[in-house]
Amino acid sequence: MGQSLLSSFGDAQQRVEKSLQALRQGEGVLLVDDEDRENEGDLIYSAEHLTAKQMALMIREGSGIVCLCLTGEKVDELKLPQMVTNNNSRHGTGFTISIEARDGVTTGVSAADRTQTVKAAIAEGAVAEDLCQPGHVFPLRARDNGVLDRRGHTEGTVDLMKLSGLAPAGLLCELTNVDGTMARLPEIVDFARKRDMQVLSIEDIAQYRQGHNL
């Protein structure tokens, strides 16, 4: 069922290439994982092109937990410690301590404030002192070799940004249904079609990377 739904967006290579083009144009995509993993779809946007309107969409249509996916190098530059020293969560998601921009925000929770926090974190030359902790944006540390190390949305997001030629930082938020349950592939595809968004899978990225260097 999953492949038949995804096939309407092209084959694996086409899905990746269409998604890369959308990201370069400042648009969002939907990234799904396997049915035997989280079986979820995440709204993905580039941090480089992020707007407050896109942040608001993630907050409104998603879980509300907006995460900033970063390379390990960037996390180290910002001196962001992991949220816990012993990560025993089911999928080992690399949460760091949450962040807020030191300047240019009020309570930090609005779409505009969260966008400002993202921009502060990814700015060239950004340092730890540009941020406060805790905050309302949740950084995630991606594995160094991306989806080839871990088939996670975090790694998929950073890989997409690298393949797009964008700054290697992206936003994700899990898509939810109106009743608060997690959206599954049929709902994810329906959401994408209504908003003319591209859908691809983490496995698509893994296959694509076999023939394309980051």
Swiss-Prot record:
UniProt-recorded Gene Ontology molecular function terms: 3,4-dihydroxy-2-butanone-4-phosphate synthase activity; magnesium ion binding; manganese ion binding
PANTHER family: 3,4-DIHYDROXY-2-BUTANONE 4-PHOSPHATE SYNTHASE (PTHR21327:SF38), GTP CYCLOHYDROLASE II-RELATED (PTHR21327)
Lineage, highest ranks first: Bacteria, Pseudomonadati, Thermodesulfobacteriota, Desulfobulbia, Desulfobulbales
Pathway entry: Cofactor biosynthesis; riboflavin biosynthesis; 2-hydroxy-3-oxobutyl phosphate from D-ribulose 5-phosphate: step 1/1
Cofactor note: Binds 2 divalent metal cations per subunit. Magnesium or manganese.
Residues the record lists as binding Mg(2+) 1: E38
Record's protein name: 3,4-dihydroxy-2-butanone 4-phosphate synthase
EC category name: lyase
Gene Ontology biological process terms in this record: riboflavin biosynthetic process
Keyword match rRNA-binding: no
EC number, as in UniProt: 4.1.99.12
Pfam annotation, one family: DHBP_synthase
InterPro entries per UniProt: DHBP_synth_RibB-like_a/b_dom (IPR017945), DHBP_synthase_RibB (IPR000422)
Presence of the UniProt keyword Transport in the record: no
